[in-house]
Amino acid sequence: MTRKLKEPHRQAVNGAYLSVMNWFFCFPRKEVSLNDLRDEVSVFDERYAKTTIRTAVSQLENEGFLQRQVLGRTWRITTNLSHSYHRSFKVGHNLTIVIENGIIEDVLEEYPQARAIILFGSYRKGDDTEESDIDIAVEISGTADPQMISLGALEHFGYRRKVKINGLVFSREKIDLNVFANIANGIVIYGFLEVKP
């Protein structure tokens, strides 16, 4: 006999599923117990019941995203860093947070002449970790030499705090070809980045 979840419980499990996934996107190298995970994901979200978190963890484990080791009565939960969610869902997660936090507007305020703003590096690829900084490239007109700048820090990046934002301001005329190739493989979040063969 198959039992269906009642609608409020199904919504809680779906919310917990996303919260657990997002927590491991923010802390991909951490090992955590079930109780600690429940406390961690309840910081921003509603307070989830332990059984709801257990259901979400089991579902993500069945999908291969999480790995669980049972140590007596305790679970040690880690994420599978080679799972496709780190290259698909995590990139979308990162992009959403970057855009929703007003980074584009902040860059345009500082560089109104920006031709393009690009998210590149580890956040673009989805292989960022707890220690990673956000890398933003800003293309401007002219012949200025490339310049590394600090764009401040995001107070909250999902479950992480105070994530630094590094900027690379460059003009097409003065950028190293290898650096430009890295930027060109990023995601254009404002304007248009012309890539000439």
Residue ranges and their predicted role:
Residues 116-123:
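Short helix-loop-helix/strand-helix junction enriched in hydrophobic and basic residues
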Residues 136-139:
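Short beta-strand->loop micro-motif that forms the acidic, two-metal-ion catalytic signature
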